[in-house]
Regions:
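Phosphate-binding glycine-rich loops and adjacent basic patches that engage nucleotide phosphates
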Residues: 5-9, 30-37, 51-58, 93-103, ...
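Enzymes that bind and transform nitrogen-containing heteroaromatic metabolites
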Residues: 76-78, 105-293
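Proteins enriched for Cys/Gly/acidic motifs involved in redox and nucleic-acid/cofactor modification
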Residues: 81, 85-111, 117
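Short, well-ordered, mixed-charge alpha-helical segments that flank or form enzyme active sites
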Residues: 35-37, 62-66, 88-92, 114-119, ...
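Short low-complexity, flexible loop/linker segments enriched in glycine and/or proline
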Residues: 69-71, 94-98, 161-162, 263
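Zn2+-dependent cytidine deaminase-like catalytic core
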Residues: 1-87
Length: 293
């Protein structure tokens, strides 16, 4: 398999073993790369190990490699076949989006009651422990988590993965805090040395930014988040920092903004079977959530 940080690729990891692969068939989901990056091209080690046939499921959308492997390997007398299937394309949904738009794949979650309230006045949680475990699993599958200072100040959440066996997966954290109102001594400060934590703000006050920098936060300055283009510029900045998949955990107000501007690739809705009526509350209207149902 491909290494966790994306390098080396699966082909190189497999063929680097001390095994005689001469005359073997190689099966891989993605077209073997032909370009130099952090590691040499996978086609080089395929040739070196004297592979006879290469079968792959999907043309790499990366322009540096796209549809180049077949010609390269054919020139080296290695048979190559693209086994086309929608399953492979579905598997690489995030990657395709990254390469097409140079933006991170954006997902979010929301928990709702049966009558579409996102807040229970009498209980902290809307859904059950199983839903929470799924949410933690989703965190582990993304490069970073994005929340807002408003949500964090209310919930005081660690925003990490706390599933046994996945504890080491601590996605970096981005906090949207336009006016630098994040509280002091939050639980998440325990993890600042173990993961990168960014504050996205429009506040240029030197004393305030210095205060947060001393605590270990990294500051990202933006103009605002009023228009769709503001959001896209923020996502471009996050993408340039190396984050390819982001997971939003925010309140309904911010989630509405993402939906309104059509910026979400995936929305996970956790809904229980309870009717809250007077015990239910929303910190924003539901019209954009209802629109995509």
């Amino acid at each position: 398999v491909t290494s966790l940080n994306g390098r080396p690729h699966a082909e190189r990891n497999a063929l680097n073993k001390k095994i005689n692969y001469t005359g073997s068939d190689l099966y891989t989901t993605l077209e073997p790369c032909t370009h130099y990056g952090d590691t040499p091209p996978c086609v080089n080690i395929i040739v070196k190990k004297k592979i006879k046939n290469v079968y792959y499921g999907f043309d790499d959308p990366d322009k540096r490699t796209h549809q180049k492997a077949k010609a390269f390997l054919k020139n080296k007398k290695i048979n190559t076949k693209n086994i086309k299937s929608s399953n492979f394309r579905n598997f690489y949904t995030n990657y395709i989006y990254n390469k097409k738009y140079n933006l991170p794949y954006i997902s979010a979650k929301i928990a709702l009651s049966k009558d579409l309230f996102s807040i229970n006045k009498k209980k902290k949680w809307i859904t059950n422990n199983q839903s929470k475990k799924v949410a933690h699993l989703l965190r582990s599958k993304n490069d970073c988590i994005i929340s807002t200072s408003k949500s964090i100040n209310i919930d005081n959440s660690l925003l990490n993965c706390r599933i046994k066996g996945l504890n080491n997966f601590k996605p970096d954290l981005f906090i949207i805090d336009l006016n630098l109102k994040l509280k002091k001594n939050l639980l998440l400060e325990k993890l600042i040395k173990k993961r990168k934590t960014f504050l996205i703000t429009k506040n240029k006050n030197a004393n305030k930014t210095l205060f947060y920098k001393k605590k270990g936060y990294k500051i990202i300055l933006i103009e605002n988040l009023e228009k769709k283009n503001n959001f896209i510029n923020m996502f471009k900045t996050i993408y340039k920092l190396g984050y390819r998949s982001v997971f939003f955990e925010t309140g309904l107000t911010f989630l509405n903004s993402l939906i309104y501007h059509k910026l979400l690739n995936m929305l996970y809705v956790f809904q229980n079977n309870k009717v809250l009526k007077k015990n239910g509350l929303n910190n924003s209207h539901m019209k954009f959530i209802n629109k995509i149902k």
